[in-house]
Amino acid sequence: MKLLVVDDNPDILQILCSIITLFGHGVDAAGDGLEAIRLLQQDRYDVVVTDADMPRVDGIQLCRFVKAQRPDIHIIGMSGDLSALKEMENAGADFCLSKPFGLDEIRSAIEKRFRASSSPHAFAAGNSETQAG
């Protein structure tokens, strides 16, 4: 399974990419929604994990773009703002995480999207207490 992680905070971006790699999945990173759109047009992804509040193109706009252009891609939204999470759900996010979240929460969200994509690959689960957000 291949994921695209989108966040304007480079620390969160690096942590999430490292965690997803440990889970055994391919991952690309984008610093905002505009960069994510470029990557989505160039490559194939199963899941997009995106923050809500970003410059240029925010996560809500990105959700709308993904659902309009690639409805087969699952979206996991992230934000510390509950109203932004609701907006992301309304824009097409399949699942939302409130920041900060723990490793088990992101793993569970990815695993659910993994199962929904019917991929034949096995999901590797780690057992750490790392937090992102």
Question: Where do the language-model regions lie?
Answer:
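Hydrophobic/aromatic residues positioned on beta-strands within the core alpha/beta folds
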Residues: I76-M78
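Acidic catalytic/metal-coordinating carboxylates
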Residues: G31-E35, D58-L62
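CheY-like receiver
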Residues: S117-G133
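Receiver (REC) domain active-site loop signature in two-component systems and cognate sites
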Residues: M54
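Two-component/phosphorelay signaling modules centered on CheY-like receiver
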Residues: P10-D28
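Active-site residues of response regulator receiver
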Residues: D51
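As written
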Residues: G59, E89-L97
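C-terminal output helix
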Residues: F101-K112, S118
